[in-house]
Each structure stands twice: as structure tokens, then as C-alpha cells.
UniProtKB/Swiss-Prot annotation:
Predominant localisation class: cytoplasm
Entry similarity comment: Belongs to the RimM family.
Function: An accessory protein needed during the final step in the assembly of 30S ribosomal subunit, possibly for assembly of the head region. Essential for efficient processing of 16S rRNA. May be needed both before and after RbfA during the maturation of 16S rRNA. It has affinity for free ribosomal 30S subunits but not for 70S ribosomes.
One of the record's GO molecular function terms: ribosome binding
Name of this protein: Ribosome maturation factor RimM
Subunit description: Binds ribosomal protein uS19.
GN (gene name): rimM
Organism for this UniProt entry: Nitrobacter winogradskyi (strain ATCC 25391 / DSM 10237 / CIP 104748 / NCIMB 11846 / Nb-255)
């Protein structure tokens, strides 16, 4: 199966004719109109953004085949995905979150720490979540200082843990 990337989430209905609020996760919010049909997380449904206009922090979008408020309301919370190969190539030092998930994580000495489980953003910057083979996950700032090496082709990231993590000794990840 081709890797897919979540590019948008449908929000509440807007108006009476089936428009929806659409939160995009792309650099250019309007790019979701150019990807063609987008699929739901389970792949069971295809939805195409036929028209969109900018609102304060989201888009107001018309989805092909969605013509009533009731239909739009049923889509609230639906995540929309596109095949990874439809996305533009990234510049040096830029990554799609989907490309990082599953990479092996090592410390600077080469000791395995686990795998990249997720990338989060709770409003103060990106957080990289590392899942070790055993024990709780580790969440660290996704900065150049903490993650100095991202080698997608080599399937790994290097983590240089901050001096203290929850009161533990420096670099004792």
C-alpha cells in the first residue's frame, strides 16, 4: 500500500449548502485543492475539494457531492489523506512527518533508543516522540540541537538529549 499523509481535517459545517470548515496541514493551505480526490483514514471514502476560500485560520471548502448541511455535519472530524507521492519534494532540512515515523533513533554514541513513533505540535513547536523497546515513550523538542541528524535514506535519527529530562541525569535517555 502506498504511504499516505494526512493533509487536512474537516471541521464543522458552514452555511446551509454543504460547505465545511477545513483545517489544512500543508505549507500552502490551498494546495489541498490541487491533489485531486483525498481519502478518509480508513480509505473507504474519497472526497475532493472542488472550491475553497481562506478564512481566519482555516478554509471554507466545498466538497464534491456534499450539498447539504446535514451531509457536511456528518463529516465533522474526518481526516483527509493523500498518497505521499503526490506531495512535492522537500527542501534540504525539511521533512514530512510521515517520512520520519518508524525511523530508528540512536544517541550520539550509536546506542539504540527506539523508533520515532510520532511528531506532535501542541502549539509551542514540534515534539518528536521516541518509543523504546521497553518502557514509556520519550518526548523531546524537535530542534536542530536535540535532533542534529535526520537521515531518511539511512532510516535513522540521532538524538542528543537535553541536559535534564524530568530530573534525570544528563544524557540518560
Amino acid at each position: 500500500m502506498t504511504a499516505r499523509v494526512c493533509v487536512a481535517r474537516i471541521g464543522a459545517a458552514h452555511g446551509l449548502r454543504g460547505e465545511v470548515r477545513l483545517w489544512t496541514f500543508t505549507e500552502d493551505p490551498m494546495s489541498v485543492t490541487r491533489y485531486g480526490p483525498l481519502s478518509t483514514k480508513d480509505g473507504a471514502r474519497q472526497l475532493e475539494v472542488s472550491h475553497a476560500r481562506a478564512a481566519s485560520d482555516h478554509l471554507i471548502a466545498t466538497l464534491t457531492g456534499v450539498t447539504t448541511r446535514e451531509e457536511a455535519e456528518r463529516l465533522n472530524g474526518t481526516e483527509l489523506y493523500v498518497a505521499r507521492d503526490k506531495l512535492p519534494e522537500t527542501d534540504e532540512g525539511e521533512f514530512y512527518h510521515a517520512d520520519l515515523i518508524g525511523l530508528a533513533a540512536f544517541d550520539a554514541a550509536g546506542t539504540a533508543l527506539g523508533t520515532v513513533a510520532a511528531i506532535h505540535n501542541f502549539g509551542a513547536g514540534d515534539i518528536i516522540e521516541i518509543a523504546p523497546a521497553r518502557g514509556p515513550t520519550l518526548m523531546l523538542p524537535f530542534t536542530d540541537a536535540v535532533v542534529p541528524i535526520v537521515d531518511i535514506a539511512g532510516g535513522r535519527v540521532v538524538i542528543e538529549a537535553p541536559a535534564e529530562i524530568d530530573g534525570e541525569e544528563p544524557n540518560s535517555v
